[in-house]
Amino acid sequence: MSSASGLRRGHPAGGEENMTETDAFYKREMFDPAEKYKMDHRRRGIALIFNHERFFWHLTLPERRGTCADRDNLTRRFSDLGFEVKCFNDLKAEELLLKIHEVSTVSHADADCFVCVFLSHGEGNHIYAYDAKIEIQTLTGLFKGDKCHSLVGKPKIFIIQACRGNQHDVPVIPLDVVDNQTEKLDTNITEVDAASVYTLPAGADFLMCYSVAEGYYSHRETVNGSWYIQDLCEMLGKYGSSLEFTELLTLVNRKVSQRRVDFCKDPSAIGKKQVPCFASMLTKKLHFFPKSN
């Protein structure tokens, strides 16, 4: 009887090992590859947009003409998705750090996620504010689990529109593709954002979106705004509330890669191309389905 009783309790020799294997089996069976982030909180969340057009003269950085078109386009698209959008223009480094610290310390308990966009010049692992550069990891670090508890397990999306190198992407035309580019007005000149930005790890549930692959120029039109933000906003408008977000970003990569420089003061840039990239540390599928009121 004692032996049978032991079997029922799971204590005979080898029993604990067998139960562990069984538990592991059921855990594997319960793993859902299509699991989605919980996006039915009261609020969608905050979307910060730091827009930098002009810089302190001592930095010798050129104006980023067209960036206000990016800011307005992003504001419209993220508002449509239900975000509370907050825009800041040409902040000094100290001001920018203060604003982002304030947002990192408020409660996001009733929010789905968080978005932060930087429209600026970049260099290495830094992004430029009006008067100085700021380390990107300093900014993302404010939203890690040990600093921002209310965003633990929630998507944290950082979008960086900045140049990331000193090379243009040389176009290679696929044999089965004819590149039919639409004509553009001469007044809409293509420029590049200065310097370079590295791909940086951030942590679980972060998504780092870059306007261009590391080591290459990011192109911006002086009237319409940057290629990346134009195409990101177009895809958000068409598929933002239906398509899984990393799938949408892949479409953005394709759209931007089909562009080329037509008008530029630098003749060597004519015909050059650009491919964005993103580094996903997301652990579930991310959808921005419309909220039910």
Swiss-Prot record:
Residues 1-20 are annotated as: Disordered. Its EC number is 3.4.22.59. GO terms for biological process: activation of innate immune response; apoptotic process; cellular response to staurosporine; epithelial cell differentiation; hepatocyte apoptotic process; intrinsic apoptotic signaling pathway by p53 class mediator; positive regulation of apoptotic process; positive regulation of necroptotic process. It is found in: Cytoplasm; Nucleus. Residues 42-44 are annotated as: Tri-arginine exosite. Disulfide bonds: none annotated. The modification Phosphoserine is found at S79, S257. The active site is at H121, C163. Heterotetramer that consists of two anti-parallel arranged heterodimers, each one formed by a 18 kDa (p18) and a 11 kDa (p11) subunits. Interacts with BIRC6/bruce. Interacts with RIPK3. Cysteine protease that plays essential roles in programmed cell death, axonal degeneration, development and innate immunity. Acts as a non-canonical executioner caspase during apoptosis: localizes in the nucleus and cleaves the nuclear structural protein NUMA1 and lamin A/LMNA thereby inducing nuclear shrinkage and fragmentation. Lamin-A/LMNA cleavage is required for chromatin condensation and nuclear disassembly during apoptotic execution. (Microbial infection) Proteolytically cleaves the N protein of coronaviruses such as MERS-CoV and SARS-CoV. The cleavage of MERS-CoV N-protein leads to two fragments and modulates coronavirus replication by regulating IFN signaling. The two fragments produced by the cleavage interact with IRF3 inhibiting its nuclear translocation after activation and reduce the expression of IFNB and IFN-stimulated genes. The same mechanism seems to be used by other coronaviruses such as SARS-CoV and SARS-CoV-2 to enhance their replication. This is Caspase-6.
